């Protein structure tokens, strides 16, 4: 028996942070359904490739089921609305406002499943002046001061050394996983239902 057996997760994430979060859930036994656009997650083409498939994509998405849906189409939204009735968790990492435009944000899905845990991962939060800014790990490394800290440990002054591990993505995915796992405990203690913060 795994800790998350019988837990169903709808995974709308791409690249690294979100898939890392949902991979941790799959590792604990959750049924994770990765929902991809017809063009697929950009990580599918990330090098290195083995037998034509990205090893990075495989590492981040092993143990998950896959479903292709064009969320711009009403019939695809209807499929998600049906799936969410039996889901426990939704994780997404679109820019703030994208899921609302699809009609798939927390407020839109909650009537279909009031017990749903919804985690929206973003680089600069869901609200505020920088919310709409795109954020990949190298951007966050620079804006957070991580790169500056790296420079302090270099022997000569130059641009920061490239970080082979996208620390910002791994930490974001790990903290998002923790937020999702903590949500039911918080609800038991407060009787308040709200999205799990993932920014």
Language model features with spans:
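Beta-strand segments within the central parallel beta-sheet cores of soluble alpha/beta enzyme folds
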Residues: 195-199
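N-terminal helix-loop segment corresponding to the beta1-alpha1 unit
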Residues: 1-188, 192-194
